[in-house]
A protein has these predicted regions:
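Sec-dependent signal peptide recognition
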Residues: 1-6
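Feature for soluble, non-membrane regions of globular proteins
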Residues: 20-215
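Short, Lys/Arg-enriched N-terminal segments with co-localized hydrophobic residues
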Residues: 7-24
Length: 215
C-alpha cells in the first residue's frame, strides 16, 4: 500500500512539473531556416548567433514568464500584441517582430517580388525601386531603436510604418509583410553606425516567396 501511495504521489508531482513546464514554454525560440553563417556577408554568423540565440531567446523567456496567470496565457502572439501594453507588449512585440524578421531571409534571396504583392507595390509606389527608396529612408530616419515595416490593411492596401522599440503593425490593426530591424544590435558588428548601408544590403537576402505569401 505504501509503495502504491508513493507511486501515485510521484505521478501527481511529475504531472504538476510537466504542466508548469508547458506554461513556461508556451512560446519557443524559432528555428532558423538556414545556417548561422548562411547570410554572410550581409549578416555575420556572430550577429545571427547573438541576435537570434541571445536577444530573441530573452524576449521569448520574458514573455513566457510575464503571461503566466494573465488573460494572455493562452493567447496568440498577434492577440497579445493587439491587446496588451507595458512589458508584456514589449516582449510579445519583439518576439513577433523577430519571428517574421528571421524567416524572411534566405541565402538564395534577393531579386524582387512577384505576383499580387508586386502589383500592389507598383500600384502604391509606382515601382519597386521607388518603394525600396522610401522604405530605406523610413528606416534611416527612425530615431533611436525600432522597426520599419511594409504592412497591409484589411482591404489589401499597403503602407510603410515606423514602429518605435518593440511595436508592430498588428498594434494598429495592420498585417506585417516585411520588416527591417533598426536596433543597433541587428547591424552594429558589421556596419557600425552606417544604418543605411545595413538597410540597403538586406535586399540581397530577402526571400520574396515567403514575403509574398504574407500578403
Amino acid at each position: 500500500m505504501l509503495t502504491l501511495c508513493l507511486s501515485l504521489l510521484l505521478m501527481i508531482t511529475n504531472s504538476q512539473i510537466t504542466d508548469k513546464k508547458e506554461k513556461v514554454m508556451k512560446f519557443e525560440l524559432i528555428q532558423l531556416p538556414y545556417a548561422a553563417n548562411a547570410l554572410e556577408p550581409v549578416i555575420s554568423k556572430e550577429t545571427i548567433e547573438f541576435h537570434h540565440g541571445k536577444h530573441l531567446q530573452t524576449y521569448v523567456n520574458n514573455l513566457n514568464n510575464l503571461i503566466q496567470g494573465t488573460k494572455f496565457e493562452n493567447a496568440t502572439l498577434e492577440q497579445i500584441v493587439a491587446e496588451s501594453d507595458g512589458a508584456i507588449f514589449n516582449n510579445a512585440g519583439q518576439t513577433l517582430n523577430h519571428n517574421l524578421y528571421f524567416t524572411q531571409f534566405s541565402p538564395y534571396g534577393g531579386g524582387r517580388p512577384t505576383g499580387a504583392l508586386a502589383k500592389a507595390i507598383d500600384a502604391t509606389w509606382g515601382s519597386f525601386e521607388n518603394f525600396q527608396k522610401e522604405f530605406v529612408a523610413a528606416g534611416t530616419g527612425l530615431f533611436g531603436s525600432g522597426w520599419v515595416w511594409l504592412a497591409k490593411d484589411k482591404d489589401g492596401k499597403l503602407s510603410i510604418t515606423k514602429e518605435a522599440n518593440g511595436s508592430n503593425p498588428v498594434a494598429h490593426g495592420l498585417k506585417p509583410i516585411l520588416g527591417f530591424d533598426v536596433w543597433e544590435h541587428a547591424y552594429y558588428l558589421e556596419y557600425r553606425n552606417r544604418r543605411p548601408d545595413h538597410l540597403n544590403a538586406l535586399w540581397k537576402i530577402i526571400d520574396w516567396d515567403t514575403v509574398g505569401k504574407r500578403y
